[in-house]
Design a protein with these regions (language model features):
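Ligand-binding pockets and gating/stacking loops
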Residues: 2-512
Length: 512
């Protein structure tokens, strides 16, 4: 493969590129600009993209990785004890803790305890307000996965277990709607959620741009700003021009002047880098305030125009990774930097929140020690983030003509990884759980068929059962894997062009 024809480096080209980049690896996070200019309409169509892609009117995907296994029967498909013939031995709840929502198939769990496993913090959560507020734009699809390994299950929740040549949902969205975006696919996830797909035919711009620290990352999006005593821009431009001229005349430059890797590197360094700097992303994406301890103005920097609002919505943005990721995700979409962003908790403890712990060890996987408390705490964390993002996106106009908000063109996919085992010691209210293939996923968007559960739950086993992805018809007893259906459902709801993909018809996901 060559970079020119596929947007991908061959092994030999990669080795050459690495040697070229050795002195400038700090540029990598923001030098992966769009490669679509190298693609012909025919090659784009072969990649599964329409020739008349909606370049001027993008749609957006937010993936939230619920690391550790977010149990759907501890949230929207919870089972009451009175409904099950095996209530004492399974993960069923006292009837009063499972609240119904008028004219909705969803349920909401209310939970209270004085501690979270062995962690001495109270857990008091109630999902009812969230469900009431968002039910009309919520869809829950039951699922059976194919792995209970964290990393593998996380990645398969993004690829549908290789449903479309191994590409991830984020990559498919970047290909479809990311043309012209500086960084179409930004990934702040962890583990398998952060992995790229295996479709090597995609342009490089479709693959995720990793971001480790969302609060500090924007400060690296300019080669000279923020450096005390840095030369003015015209001097830097002159130095860069001189450097490029010398490189071109060097023995190395003349020897490898026809190398596609060197041509690409020169384009990144000489064309894409100045373009990215001209976008002023170092300001637009910067949530940090100008304080004595963070003297932005001293170094010629300033906070984003949206900074104060985001710091109010996400007060823990600097110490709580999820809040910081959510703040950056909103800005990446608002300023049309990206069409796909990925975020979510990792397995590390985060200090903060009203009780001192923002993220418990192992995130949802703390359910090994305290299933009910862990699920309640982490679902509250996820749903709070989702609610804040939706509120921000609803208030943000998409454009001046259509009357649409950003939310009208956005889909949030909560990738739950896998489920949890259902048995418990007879009548126990505190117990641990293991990993289980059986679960469900949550989608939220004006584009999905809202107020809908695809599939259902058998109350006597508390296992979910499947559905027909085309018609939405429930199929009790169906417990076979349906990962491609979920993958196709997300893209179908968004209106992606799936011609040539071989994906199943998932019309049941889409609002009509």
């Amino acid at each position: 493969m060559t970079l020119k024809t596929t947007g991908r480096l061959s092994r030999r080209e990669l080795l050459r590129a690495l040697s070229l980049c050795a002195a400038g690896t700090s540029l990598a996070p923001f030098l992966s600009g769009c490669r679509d200019s190298r693609q012909t309409p025919e090659s784009l169509e072969k990649l599964g993209r329409k020739r008349d892609a909606l370049d001027g009117k993008p749609k957006f995907l937010i993936v939230i990785g619920a690391a550790g296994g977010a149990s759907i029967v501890d949230s929207f498909l919870a089972v009451r004890q009175s409904e099950s013939a095996n209530a004492a031995a399974l993960n069923t709840f006292p009837d009063a803790q499972v609240q119904g929502v008028a004219d909705s198939p969803f349920r909401a769990v209310k939970y209270s305890n004085t501690r979270l496993g062995s962690i001495n913090i109270p857990v008091n959560t109630d999902q009812l307000a969230f469900v009431k507020k968002h039910a009309s734009e919520m869809l829950v699809a039951t699922s059976v996965g194919t792995s209970v390994n964290h990393g593998i299950a996380q990645k398969r929740s993004l690829t549908g277990n290789g449903a479309w040549r191994g590409r991830t949902l984020q990559e498919a969205v970047a290909l479809q709607w990311g043309s012209g975006m500086p960084l179409p696919n930004v990934n702040m996830g962890t583990g398998g959620y952060a992995e790229r797909g295996t479709d090597d035919s995609l342009p490089l711009s479709c693959f995720g741009e990793p971001v480790v620290n969302p609060s500090l990352w924007p400060l690296g999006l300019d080669g000279s700003r923020g450096i005390a005593g840095a030369p003015p821009k015209d001097v830097i431009a002159l130095a860069r021009s001189t450097r490029d001229a010398l490189d071109q005349k060097s023995i190395f430059g003349r020897t490898f002047q026809d190398s596609s890797a060197l041509k690409r590197w020169n384009e990144q360094r000489g064309v894409q880098q100045p373009k990215l700097e001209a976008l002023d992303l170092i300001t637009k994406l910067n949530v940090l305030p100008d304080l004595p301890s963070i003297p932005l103005s001293k170094y010629g920097l300033e906070s984003s125009a949206d900074g104060a609002r985001l710091r109010e919505v996400f007060p823990g943005f600097f110490t709580d990774p999820v809040q910081g990721q959510a703040a950056l995700a909103f800005l990446l979409l608002k300023y049309r930097v990206s069409v796909s962003v990925t975020l979510g908790p990792d397995f590390n403890v985060a200090v903060g929140g009203p009780n001192g712990i923002a993220n418990p060890p192992l995130a949802f996987d703390i359910s090994h020690n305290d299933h009910r408390g862990g699920q309640a705490f982490m679902w509250a964390r996820i749903l709070s983030t989702v609610d804040s993002l939706i509120t921000l996106l609803k208030a943000e106009p998409f454009d001046a003509d259509s009357g649409e908000s950003m939310w009208d063109r956005t889909l949030i996919y909560v990738a739950t990884e896998f489920g949890r085992t259902r048995p418990r010691p007879s009548g126990a209210t505190e117990f641990g759980s293991g990993h289980d293939l059986n679960n469900g996923f949550l989608l939220l968007s004006p584009m999905v068929k809202g107020n809908t559960v695809l599939g259902g739950v058998d109350p006597n086993t508390t296992l979910t059962y499947g559905f027909d992805a085309r018609t939405g018809e429930r199929q009790p007893g169906k417990v076979t894997s349906n990962e491609p259906d979920i993958f196709s459902g997300v893209l179908t709801a968004m209106g992606a062009d799936l011609s040539g993909s071989g994906l199943p018809d998932a019309s049941a996901f889409k609002r009509t």
